[in-house]
């Protein structure tokens, strides 16, 4: 059926992210051009979605908060720079400027090997540059979520504490209030410093995205162990996710559907064997019966998608 039939009145199409192919898909589905971003705007979005934006923001935050931040990005424009930097750092993480979430990463643990060289040459040929970062002694992944109104204003939308697998791909989120998340970070970074960094980030994002982009922005951060006095530092801008992201989904889910004071997890799980997946699902249904209080989840397991005889994934919350 036509996608246009789903839109009512002056409603606009809101995607988790945009590209020209998605725009063509909506046009083919009957959506009017005035409800979609223009090709010119998509070209601006492409520049704004580059990982190079995170490089600039990290430097800005490090200049403002040198006593409590870490974060180093080296921009590489040719294969000689790649070899020199990788060999000097011994172990590092290479990133392409544009890629999907959790993708476009190369963990260099054994120097500038032939596979690493081939990967760098391909990225330089296709995208023109890449970045190198140290591998940090990470304690916790978290994010600050923001919303840009496209009219110059960016507002804070909440915190996200998330988990990833060994390849950096997303696996889940903590379900907790903003206050509970602040408490969990406070052992590593004072609330005063956290709110200062949050406001500085908000202002910086407003100057970069505020007048062009309408939608959510997620700034991935991490707490790292340090040899400095307090033992911890925060990386203020690992990535900028210029889209609706899973951290926002978890934040909104908690605020709308979870009983105040409760905590839990929001998870996406891949299990290649369907029988094993269904067994886990049925065991969780048995072990964590769902309890609802005053229309909100107080405890238990809730699958967010059907687990069928063909499923290899499940998405669920457990309170």
Each model region followed by its residue ranges:
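Single conserved hydrophobic/aromatic residue that forms the stacking wall/gate
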Residues: 1-9, 13-14
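Glycine-rich phosphate-binding loop of ATP-grasp-fold ATP-dependent ligases
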Residues: 72-73, 91-117, 143, 166-185
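A long amphipathic alpha-helix within ATP-dependent nucleotide-binding catalytic cores
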Residues: 126-127, 134, 156, 168-232, ...
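ATP-dependent carboxylate/phosphate-activation module, predominantly the ATP-grasp catalytic core
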Residues: 146-201, 241-268
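Peripheral (often C-terminal) accessory segments that flank ATP-dependent C-N-forming ligase machineries
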Residues: 259-319
């Amino acid at each position: 059926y036509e996608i246009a039939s789903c839109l009512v009145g002056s409603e606009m199409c809101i995607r988790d992210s945009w590209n020209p192919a998605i725009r063509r898909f909506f046009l083919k589905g009957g959506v009017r051009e005035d409800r979609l971003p223009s090709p010119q705007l998509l070209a601006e979005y492409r520049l704004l979605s580059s990982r190079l934006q995170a490089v600039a923001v990290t430097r800005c935050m490090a200049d403002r908060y040198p006593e409590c931040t870490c974060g180093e990005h080296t921009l590489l424009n040719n294969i000689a720079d790649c070899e020199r930097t990788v060999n000097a750092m011994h172990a590092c993480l290479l990133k392409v400027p544009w890629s999907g979430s959790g993708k476009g990463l190369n963990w260099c643990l054994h120097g500038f090997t032939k596979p690493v060289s081939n990967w760098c040459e391909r990225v330089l040929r296709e995208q023109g540059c890449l970045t190198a970062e140290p591998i940090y002694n990470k304690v916790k992944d978290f994010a600050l979520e923001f919303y840009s109104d496209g009219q110059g204003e960016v507002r804070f939308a909440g915190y996200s504490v998330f988990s990833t697998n060994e390849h950096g791909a997303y696996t889940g989120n903590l379900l907790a209030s903003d206050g509970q998340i602040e408490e969990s970070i406070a052992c590593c970074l004072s609330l005063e410093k956290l709110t200062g960094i949050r406001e500085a980030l908000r202002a910086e994002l407003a100057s970069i995205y505020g007048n062009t982009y309408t939608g959510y922005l997620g700034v991935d951060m991490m707490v790292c162990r340090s040899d400095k006095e307090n033992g911890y530092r925060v990386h203020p801008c690992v990535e900028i996710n210029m889209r609706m992201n899973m951290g926002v989904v978890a934040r909104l889910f908690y605020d709308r559907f979870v009983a105040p004071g409760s905590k839990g997890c929001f998870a996406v799980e891949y299990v290649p064997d369907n029988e094993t997946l269904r067994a886990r699902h049925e065991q969780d249904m048995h072990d964590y019966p769902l309890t609802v209080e005053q229309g909100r989840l107080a405890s238990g397991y809730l699958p967010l998608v059907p687990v069928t005889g063909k499923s290899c994934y499940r998405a669920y919350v457990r309170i």
